[in-house]
Amino acid sequence: SSEASGAQPAETEPAVSEAPSVDDSTPYGQHGTLHVENGKLTDADGNIVQLYGMSTHGIAWFPQYINYDSFRTLRDDWNTNCIRLAMYTAEYGGYCADGDKEQLKQLVRDGVSYATELGMYVIVDWHILSDCDPNQNKDEAIAFFREMSEAFADNDNVLYEICNEPNSGTSWDSIKSYAEEVIPVIREQKPDAVILVGTPTWSQEIDKAAASPLTFDNVMYTLHFYAGTHKDDLRNRLETCAQNNLPVFVSEFGMCDASGNGANDFDSTTKWLDLLNKYQISFCCW
C-alpha cells in the first residue's frame, strides 16, 4: 500500500486550497478560469461560458445537502456546472445573527471542496435579505471575504457574490460604496476572480447599475426573478441591459411567485429561460 512505502495515503479529504479538477470532462476542465469580457462570462480562450445550476437554500438550515453525492448528482444527472452556496447573514441562524460562524465557514469550505473535486464552478453567496442594506454588516462581510478569498486562493472555480438582495429602498449608491470596499479585499488574494454584485429592489434594478457601473474588471450585476410575479417588464429591462453589454448574472430565480407560493408558471419560466439562453446569461435556480 502507499502507506507501506512511506508515502501519504491517497484517500485523504481534499484540501480546500487544492486546484480544481482539470479532467477535461468536467466543467472547469473544459473552461478553466473565467473572466468578464464585453459583458459576457468567458473562458481563457475567449469562448462565452454560460453557468447553470442550483442554489442551496440557507446552509445553516439545510447543511445535509452540502455533500459530494448531492453535487455529483446535480452535475451528472441534472447537467449543471455550477452550485451556489447561500449563507444567510441576518436571518435565524445567520452569520451575523445567532449563527455559529465557524460551523458556517466550514460548510462553505466543504461546499467549495466538493465542487472543486467535481470540477464545478461554485458561488460563495453572502445572502443578505432582512439586513436590507449590505452596509449594515459591512465589517463582517469584509472579514468573511478576506478569510474566504485567502482559503480559496488556489481555487479559480470560485465566484464571490457579495450581497444577495439589497431591498427596502437601499440605493445603488449605497450598494456601490459597499462594493468599493469589499471588492478590493477579495482582489488582494484573487485579482481576477469573478465577483457578483446585487442590485436594488431584491436584485431587479440592473438598470441602475448600468447607469453608474463599478470600475473594477470581472464584475457582474445580479438579476433575480420569480417567474409567477416578474414578467415582461423585468424581461424587457434585462434585454435592454444585455443589448448594451451589461454583465448580468441571474444568481437566483424561481418558477413560482416571489413569495415562494403559488403554482409553477411554466409559460413565464420558458420565456425567461429563452431570454437567458439568447444572451448566454448564467443562472442558478432557487
Residue ranges and their predicted role:
Residues 33-34, 58, 63, 121, ...:
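Extracellular glycoside hydrolase catalytic/binding regions
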Residues 55, 89, 126-130, 164-166, ...:
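Short, histidine-centered active-site or binding-site loop motifs used for metal coordination
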Residues 14-82, 98:
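N-terminal carbohydrate-binding accessory modules
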Residues 91-95, 131-133, 168-170, 257-259:
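A short acidic, helix-capping loop that chelates divalent metal ions and anchors anionic groups
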